[in-house]
């Protein structure tokens, strides 16, 4: 039986005559059979059908978007990525040509299609793509200028799942389909009418670098795109390239290379602006071209090995089904039951976005580029190596979600960070492009490693991890290393004063100044390391780090009741504007950052003069619409009400945020998704708990969004979270039970969650006793 879902998926494949009567061509019937097989497989699956890959690909249309402080933050900057979770390369339709900073490869509202890109874009970020290449099919005459070959497309012709993408290009009468494995992509081009067809293959180097070569006899194309990293606002060579090896399953009649509009019959080209290769075919209606592409960060030979290992000669249908099963298993670790289908779509889309990064970086044989290694190759003996840790964002919820659901993967992440520290000499702060970056603030690789350690995730060299974390916390790199992005920014000032004074402008960083935010976040990282030091019996370190964890108090001005810039002599920065963007605050205001003391909320309460004052300050923040969910430093703020006399306000604000900051459709996210952090917040909050202080292993409770949520843990246990609501509007908890016994705390431990069982929330329409 063909379901409504089937019709929705196959609609773009149905041709209509002038009188709008549907009629299927012979070819379309054949294609329809495949689409029905795929759609039936999806229909039988329980969760992948809810994922909306286009969510976050246009400016936010959520209810809260009108209050966003920085309009550039209205772009979530996700892409409709086709690939398994945490893969090396994501395959995406391309509507933007460049690898420029903050420019995603795909935006929903763009009208022109430029091909399928093998992308290393950090999902939801404001960084840049790197080592990418694009495959563009065209028909008719050969055109090599992007402005000439770009073609109109419509969303009515698009189909997207985590495992499959399809669009028709009416201007060329071509259909483009794509699927992927961890390191490889398979693209299928179908002629909808007889014509000359060309494939354009372009390394996307903005620096006019790169290489591409055609082997006509073997039907193979290979090349590379050298990677550039952002460092202090400009690009530098990253010391490795994005390599590709492509095999075409159809003979081509013509081939050559080009640089912009300059076309040549040569079979290779190197280091030219807008370079690429073209392949020509004569296709009859219904004929196809299958393009098998392997990728690597070490060599063309490795890209070929990855291709032959993962794809070989498999057909599109097989890979779509295989990758769909991988996603089904991964997403299916959390099963939600609820009559609200819209919320399920938002939830599973969030869970999909939260499983894009960190990025797999090694080949099938274990080869990977040495961290900051200038084209040096290393080989793993076991496990996998990962990079692109958007650490300032993801230590808060995205990485804790991995710790909760996939602890073995968290071990790989920890081992990868340790390898980086060993190879580069210092534990990196924000490792992207397999390099030091001096981007963002804090030292949150330490926070992640401590969080994993405290949750019993210890499949790595703990002593070496501690050595590297301690080095960051207690030592200053030499001048050359510091300039290269190693070590904590402003560490000497921080150690001398117990805060970073306004006189230290932090010149050697992408984000300069921001002294108060750095102080607050270093205090948290010191606390994180202190927890590990205590467990390892490092008594002296524990004592010093515990004292330093209170450094947040040194930038809290009790006269104004908020965090504030401070000079070396102890005086305060003037004037003071609590709700303005200030140079000593990172991407926010003093009012917003004042609440960043996740490790010592009782200490913050004391500074503020009691629980009631904390509650009043929180009330004021929300009443002024100063809470900025689109930026990470405030993600723990709604849960601070759990420390006041009115924990029901956590339930109120979290329920409001779930409804106002997230939605369906291309504009469904209210800010940069930042490698899945925004999405991970939704996943946790919808389940009914959140790691406001991930290092502690405690989760703050709130009211669950769904009637029932079942979490399957790696240890074989299951936790069922049930919300028993008096009405559809019930969001306030009157009682909680765990395995039939009353549970009266506002937080729950990681260890207790992993024991499984049933957590029941009894919800009502008003706060207070039932």
Residue ranges of model-derived segments:
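Bacterial Sec-dependent N-terminal signal peptides
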Residues: 1-45
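Accessory carbohydrate-recognition regions in carbohydrate-active enzymes
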Residues: 44-447, 453-520, 533-554, 560, ...
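Conserved catalytic core of nucleotide polymerization and phosphodiester-bond processing enzymes
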Residues: 723
């Amino acid at each position: 039986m063909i379901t409504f879902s089937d019709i929705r998926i196959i609609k773009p494949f149905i041709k209509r005559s002038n009188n709008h009567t549907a009629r299927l061509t012979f070819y379309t019937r054949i294609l329809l059979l495949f689409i029905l097989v795929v759609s039936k497989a999806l229909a039988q699956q329980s969760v992948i059908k809810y994922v909306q890959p286009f969510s976050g690909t246009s400016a936010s249309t959520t209810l809260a978007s009108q209050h966003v402080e920085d309009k550039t933050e209205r772009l979530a900057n996700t892409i409709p990525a086709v690939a398994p979770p945490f893969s090396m390369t994501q395959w995406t339709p391309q509507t933007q040509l460049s690898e420029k900073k903050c420019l995603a490869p795909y935006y929903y509202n763009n009208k022109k299609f430029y091909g399928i890109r093998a992308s290393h874009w950090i999902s939801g970020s404001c960084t840049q793509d790197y080592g990418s290449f694009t495959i563009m099919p065209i028909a008719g005459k050969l055109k090599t200028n992007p402005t000439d070959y770009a073609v109109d497309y419509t969303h009515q012709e698009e189909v997207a799942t985590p495992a499959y993408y399809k669009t028709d290009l009416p201007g060329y009468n071509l259909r483009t389909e794509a699927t992927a494995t961890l390191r490889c992509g398979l693209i299928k081009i179908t002629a909808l009418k007889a014509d000359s067809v060309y494939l354009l293959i372009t390394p996307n180097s903005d620096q006019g670098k790169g290489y591409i070569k055609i082997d006509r006899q073997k039907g193979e194309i290979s090349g590379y795109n050298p990677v550039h990293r952002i460092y202090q606002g400009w690009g530098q060579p990253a010391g490795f390239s994005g390599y590709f090896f492509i095999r075409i399953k159809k003979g081509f009649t013509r081939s050559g290379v080009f640089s912009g509009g300059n076309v040549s019959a040569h079979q290779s080209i190197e280091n030219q602006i807008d370079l690429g290769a073209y392949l020509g075919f004569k296709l009859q209606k219904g004929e196809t071209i299958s393009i098998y592409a392997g990728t690597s960060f070490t060599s063309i030979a490795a890209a070929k090995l990855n291709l032959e290992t993962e794809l070989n000669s498999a057909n599109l249908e097989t890979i779509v089904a295989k990758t769909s099963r991988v996603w089904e298993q991964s997403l299916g670790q959390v099963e939600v039951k609820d009559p609200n289908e819209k919320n399920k779509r938002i939830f599973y889309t969030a869970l999909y976005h939260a499983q894009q990064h960190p990025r797999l970086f090694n080949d099938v044989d274990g080869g990977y580029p040495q961290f900051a290694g200038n084209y040096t190759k290393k080989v793993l003996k076991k496990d996998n190596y990962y990079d692109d840790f958007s650490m300032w964002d993801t230590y808060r919820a995205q990485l804790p979600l991995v710790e909760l659901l996939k602890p073995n993967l968290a071990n790989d992440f920890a081992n990868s960070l340790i390898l980086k520290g060993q190879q580069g000499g210092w534990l990196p702060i924000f490792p992207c492009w397999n390099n030091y970056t001096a981007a963002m603030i804090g030292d949150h690789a330490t926070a992640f490693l401590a969080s994993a350690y405290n949750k019993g995730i210890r499949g790595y060299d703990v002593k070496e991890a501690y050595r590297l974390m301690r080095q960051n916390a207690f030592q200053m790199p030499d001048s050359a290393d510091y300039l290269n992005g190693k070590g904590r920014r402003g560490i000497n000032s921080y150690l001398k004063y117990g805060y970073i004074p306004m006189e230290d402008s932090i010149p050697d960083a992408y984000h300069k100044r921001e002294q108060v935010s750095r102080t607050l976040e270093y205090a948290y990282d010191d606390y994180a390391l202190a927890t590990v030091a205590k467990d390892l019996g490092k008594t002296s370190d524990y004592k010093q780090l515990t004292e330093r964890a209170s450094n947040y108090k040194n930038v809290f001005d009790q006269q104004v009741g908020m965090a504030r810039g401070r000079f070396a002599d102890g005086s305060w920065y003037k004037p003071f504007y609590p709700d303005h963007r200030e140079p000593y605050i990172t991407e926010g205001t003093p009012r917003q950052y004042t609440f960043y003391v996740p490790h010592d909320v009782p200490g913050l309460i004391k500074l503020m003069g009691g629980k009631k004052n904390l509650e009043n300050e929180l009330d004021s923040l929300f009443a002024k619409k100063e809470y900025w969910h689109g930026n990470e430093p405030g993600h723990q703020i709604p849960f601070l009400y759990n420390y006041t006399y009115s924990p029901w306000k956590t339930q109120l604000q979290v329920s409001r945020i779930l409804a106002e900051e997230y939605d369906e459709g291309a504009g469904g996210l209210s800010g940069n998704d930042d490698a899945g952090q925004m999405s991970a917040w939704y996943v946790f909050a919808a389940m009914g708990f959140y790691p406001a202080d991930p290092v502690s292993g405690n989760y703050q409770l709130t009211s669950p969004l769904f009637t029932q949520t079942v979490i399957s843990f790696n240890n074989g246990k299951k936790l069922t979270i049930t919300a028993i609501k008096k009405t559809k509007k019930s969001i306030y908890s009157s009682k909680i039970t765990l395995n039939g016994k009353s549970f009266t705390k506002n937080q729950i431990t990681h260890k207790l969650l992993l024991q499984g069982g049933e957590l029941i929330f009894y919800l009502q329409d008003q706060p207070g006793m039932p």
